[in-house]
Amino acid sequence: MSASGEALTTRDYIGGHLNNLQLDLRTFELVNPHAENTPSFWVLNIDSLFFSVLMGLLFLWIFRKVAVKATSGVPGKFQTAVEMVIGFVDSSVRDMYHGKSKVIAPLALTVFVWVLLMNALDLLPIDFIPYIGEHILGLPALRIVPTADVSITLSMAIGVFILILFYSIKMKGVKGFTKELTLQPFNHPVFIPINLILEGVSLLSKPVSLGLRLFGNMYAGELIFILIAGLLPWWSQWLLSLPWAIFHILIITLQAFIFMVLTIVYLSMASEEH
C-alpha cells in the first residue's frame, strides 16, 4: 500500500521502486541505480537476500516459540493458528505424496510458511521501508519483497530441482533414472536422442516454471501497488489500494500454496518407482 508524498516524476517514482540494493561482487561496492552502469551478472541483490533470510528466521522463531510453550490443555489462539497450518500442510502431503519419506512434510511446511511470509511483505506501505532505507540508512535503493525478485524464486526452485534429482536417483538408481530419460516415451534405442531431448526439456521446465510462476505473480502485484501510488493523487489512492490489498491477501496465500503443492507433486513423481 502507499504512503507516497515525494516530489518525483511518475517515471522516476516507479523506476525507483523497481531497483534492488545491489552489491557489485567485482568491487564489493554498492551499485548506484541512478548512475549509468553497464549491466553485469556479478551483482548480488542484498536486499532480497536480507529480507528472505529475515522471514526465514521469523518462521523459525514463531514455530519454536509455539513448540516451547505448547500445552496439552486448551491451546491459546496463537498455538491454535499454528496447529491449523501444520494440520493443513500435513493433510496436503498425505493426499499428494505417496512415498515414505519423513522429510517431505517438514519441507512442505517450511516452503509454505516461508513463501507466505515473504509474499506478505508486499502488504506493507510501498514507500515506508524504501523511505527508511534512503533517508535514514542512506541506501541508494531498497526493495522488500524477495519473491518479486526472480533470482530468489529461481534459487528456491533450483533447490527443489536438486531434491527432485536426489529422490529420482535414490528411488530408481542411476541406471533406472538414465533409462527414464532415454527410453521414454519411445522404448527403442533408435529414439534415445529424441527421448533425451523430450525428457530433458520436461525435467528442466519444472524448476523454471516453478520459479517464474511465483515471481510473475508477485512482481505484477507489487507493480500494481507502485502504479496506484505513482499515478494517483495521494488523497484518492486508498480507493484502489485498499481493495487491491484485500484481494492481494488471497493472491499471496494462493501463490504460497501453489509453490508448496508443486513441490510436493514433483517430489512425489520423482519418488515413484518404475
Curated annotation (Swiss-Prot):
The keyword RNA-binding does not apply. Signal peptide: none annotated. It is a multi-pass membrane protein. It comes from the Bacteria. InterPro entries: ATP_syn_F0_a_bact/chloroplast (IPR045082), ATP_synth_F0_asu (IPR000568), ATP_synth_F0_asu_AS (IPR023011), F0_ATP_A_sf (IPR035908). The chain crosses the membrane at residues 43-63, 103-123, 149-169, 223-243, 245-265. GO terms for biological process: proton motive force-driven plasma membrane ATP synthesis. It is found in: Cell inner membrane. Keywords: ATP synthesis, Cell inner membrane, Cell membrane, CF(0), Hydrogen ion transport, Ion transport, Membrane, Transmembrane, Transmembrane helix, Transport. GO terms for cellular component: plasma membrane; proton-transporting ATP synthase complex. GO terms for molecular function: proton-transporting ATP synthase activity, rotational mechanism. Belongs to the ATPase A chain family. F-type ATPases have 2 components, CF(1) - the catalytic core - and CF(0) - the membrane proton channel. CF(1) has five subunits: alpha(3), beta(3), gamma(1), delta(1), epsilon(1). CF(0) has three main subunits: a(1), b(2) and c(9-12). The alpha and beta chains form an alternating ring which encloses part of the gamma chain. CF(1) is attached to CF(0) by a central stalk formed by the gamma and epsilon chains, while a peripheral stalk is formed by the delta and b chains. Key component of the proton channel; it plays a direct role in the translocation of protons across the membrane. This is ATP synthase subunit a. It comes from Proteus mirabilis (strain HI4320).
